[in-house]
Structure formats: C-alpha cells, structure tokens
C-alpha cells in the first residue's frame, strides 16, 4: 500500500474463505439439568391434560330436530371422546321430547 489511506484496490485477499460445518461430533453427557427438565415437561403435560374447560355444544334433538345447547366441563381428550360419541350412536333428546320417550 502506498499513501496514508488504503484503498480497496490495494487490499488483496490471498486466502479464500473455508466453509465451516455447523454440525459438530461432540456428544453431551446426560446431566441432572436435562433429567429435571424432562420431569418438568412431563408434569406440565399431565397438568395440561387434567385441566377442565367449559365447552358449549350445539346439536339437534334426535326426535324433533330442534336445537339443543349443552355446556360440559371436561378435559381436552374427553371432549374428543364426546365428539366421537355424538357422531356415533349417542343421541341427544330435547326436554320436550324426553317425557315422550
């Protein structure tokens, strides 16, 4: 380089960049932190599945086809079971048709 300030044409890069692999071959030993984290996740999953929520269901009476509204409180998996029952052989009857049955 000549002069007080370098210019781009004066800078010559002789080395080409080498690609660096981001995957390393190191393996970490199981630590207590990982075990604690897995236990915490399992506890949270159990608590999440046992949380009760209210669900509003709108269906029709199997006798007169009028709308019937239900509110149930259950867990997520249980509402899926109820959904399967309603699509299957379970029939809901309105209060007017119930005494006639």
Curated annotation (Swiss-Prot):
Pfam families: E7. GO terms for biological process: DNA-templated transcription; symbiont-mediated perturbation of host cell cycle G1/S transition checkpoint; symbiont-mediated suppression of host innate immune response; symbiont-mediated suppression of host type I interferon-mediated signaling pathway. Keywords: Activator, DNA-binding, Early protein, G1/S host cell cycle checkpoint dysregulation by virus, Host cytoplasm, Host nucleus, Host-virus interaction, Inhibition of host innate immune response by virus, Inhibition of host interferon signaling pathway by virus, Interferon antiviral system evasion, Metal-binding, Modulation of host cell cycle by virus, Oncogene, Transcription, Transcription regulation, Viral immunoevasion, Zinc, Zinc-finger. Its main location: host cell. A motif (LXCXE motif) lies at residues 22-26. Homodimer. Homooligomer. Interacts with host RB1; this interaction induces dissociation of RB1-E2F1 complex thereby disrupting RB1 activity. Interacts with host EP300; this interaction represses EP300 transcriptional activity. Interacts with protein E2; this interaction inhibits E7 oncogenic activity. Interacts with host TMEM173/STING; this interaction impairs the ability of TMEM173/STING to sense cytosolic DNA and promote the production of type I interferon (IFN-alpha and IFN-beta). This is Protein E7.
């Amino acid at each position: 380089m000549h002069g007080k300030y370098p210019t781009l044409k004066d800078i010559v890069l002789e080395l080409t960049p080498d690609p660096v692999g981001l995957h390393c071959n190191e393996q970490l030993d199981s630590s207590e932190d990982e075990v604690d984290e897995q236990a915490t996740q399992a506890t949270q999953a159990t608590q999440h599945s046992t949380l009760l929520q209210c669900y509003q269901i709108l269906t029709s009476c199997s006798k007169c086809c009028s709308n019937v509204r239900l509110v149930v409180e259950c867990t997520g998996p249980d509402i899926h079971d109820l959904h399967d029952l309603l699509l299957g052989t379970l029939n809901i009857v309105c209060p007017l048709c119930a005494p006639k049955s």
